[in-house]
Amino acid sequence: MGNNMTLITEFILLGFPLSPRMQMLLFALFSLFYAFTLLGNGTIVGLICLDSRLHTPMYFFLSHLAIVDIAYACNTVPQMLVNLLDPVKPISYAGCMTQTFLFLTFAITECLLLVVMSYDRYVAICHPLRYSAIMSWRVCSTMAVTSWIIGVLLSLIHLVLLLPLPFCVSQKVNHFFCEITAILKLACADTHLNETMVLAGAVSVLVGPFSSIVVSYACILGAILKIQSEEGQRKAFSTCSSHLCVVGLFYGTAIVMYVGPRHGSPKEQKKYLLLFHSLFNPMLNPLIYSLRNSDVKNTLKRVLRTQRAL
C-alpha cells in the first residue's frame, strides 16, 4: 500500500439521482411516512402499556417489534431526508459505521422477534391448555432479551471486520444510507471475508428463521383445520394473518436483497427494495396489526373516549 494513499474520513450518500423538484417532493412524502411510522408504532407501544388486558405474551412481543421499527426508521430515515435537501452533505466515517452497525442490529433483532412471535402463535393454537405454563413471563422476557443480544453480537462481528478496512477508492456511497454491501465496494483491500460473512449471516438469520416460521405455520394450519366451529377457525386465522403479512413483507424483501443472486439483479432495484424494507415496512406494521386486531382497536377506542371525557 503506497504511502501517498489518501484515506477517506467521510462519505457522500448518492441516494436517488433525481431532479431537485422531485427530491423536494420525496422529502415531503418521506417526512410524512416517517411521522406516521413514529406515530403508529408509538401508539401500539402506548396502548399495550396502558391497557392491562393487553399484558399478554403476544402483545409483549408486539411492543418489542414496534420499538424495533421505531429504532429502524430513526436510524436511516433522518439521514435520507438530510440528503434529499442537501445531496452533497457528507456523513462522517464514525457516523457511517454507527449507522451500519445499528441497521444490522435492528434488522437481525426483528428477524428473531418474528420467529419468537410465530412460536407464540404456535403454542397458543396447537397447545392452548399448556400455553400459560410454556409462555411464562420469564420465558417471554428471556426470548425478547436474547433476540436483542444476538442482534447486537452478530452486528458486532460485521463491524469488527469492517473497521480495519481502508477506504481510498471513492467517498461516494451508491445508497441512501450506509448499507454494508455498498460500503464494502469502496474498500481498497480484499473484502472477500466480509462478503462471505454477510452472505453467511444473511442465510443464518433469514433462511433458517424463515424456515422455522414456515414449519410453525404448517402446524398451526393443521390445528386450525381441526377446529370444529367456523367462528373458532375465523378467529384463529385472524390472529395469525397479521403476523403472516408482516413476515412476508420483511423476509420477502430481505431474502431478495441479501440471499438472492449476486449477479443479474440491478443495483437500483435492490436499493428501492431496501427503501421499502426500511421506510414502508415499519410504517405498515402497526396498520396491519391494528386493522386486523379487535383488541388493539377496542383499546384505542377506549383511550380516545377517555380523552374526550377529560
UniProtKB/Swiss-Prot annotation:
The keyword Disulfide bond applies. Its main location: membrane. It is a multi-pass membrane protein. GO terms for biological process: G protein-coupled receptor signaling pathway; sensory perception of smell. InterPro entries: GPCR_Rhodpsn (IPR000276), GPCR_Rhodpsn_7TM (IPR017452), Olfact_rcpt (IPR000725). CDD domains: 7tmA_OR2A-like. Glycans are attached at residues 4, 194. The chain crosses the membrane at residues 25-45, 54-74, 97-117, 149-169, 205-225, 240-260, 274-291. Residues 1-24, 75-96, 170-204, 261-273 are extracellular. The keyword Transport does not apply. Belongs to the G-protein coupled receptor 1 family. Odorant receptor. This is Olfactory receptor 2A7. It comes from Mus musculus (Mouse).
